[in-house]
């Protein structure tokens, strides 16, 4: 899911023929990556140097982390990620909150928000020979379904784009039954 999709694509590239298929759920599009400058709007291109400078400063990244590493804030973010509201509970909040209390979690966060020149899914699709399924939440607030459709239209190894109605960034949590059925169908089709 999300950035894990890009990691999975890179792993599939390395594994070559040992990868039989790939399921990407709301794969990260990494809209802030430097390689996407030409596709960004003028305002984003103007703001990008400022954003990069600010988030590279520990005082800023630590402040952002300390504000985000709060169960109330995590719950607010989850409400955006899960527009149906399904499966947002104390257990999920705790699962996401607990790692923020570990040693070096601030540095991990700082590293993550400073990834401005890394792998893009679009750079990896054509290096993966296995069939790919995209599963997308219809109401994902961060990863554009329009771009997912463009990926499918432009990359032959993307065999399916399945959209889960009313789901957001984590359709596997909001609607696990439908997500699992779609994955099983893809596995059957690609045997």
Kindly give the residue locations of the regions a language model identified.
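Flexible "cap/lid" loop of the alpha/beta hydrolase fold
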Residues: 9, 13, 20-62
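Conserved loop-alpha-helix segment in the C-terminal half of the alpha/beta-hydrolase fold
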Residues: 127-167
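Generic structural signal for small/hydrophobic residues in well-ordered secondary structure
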Residues: 26, 77, 96, 109, ...
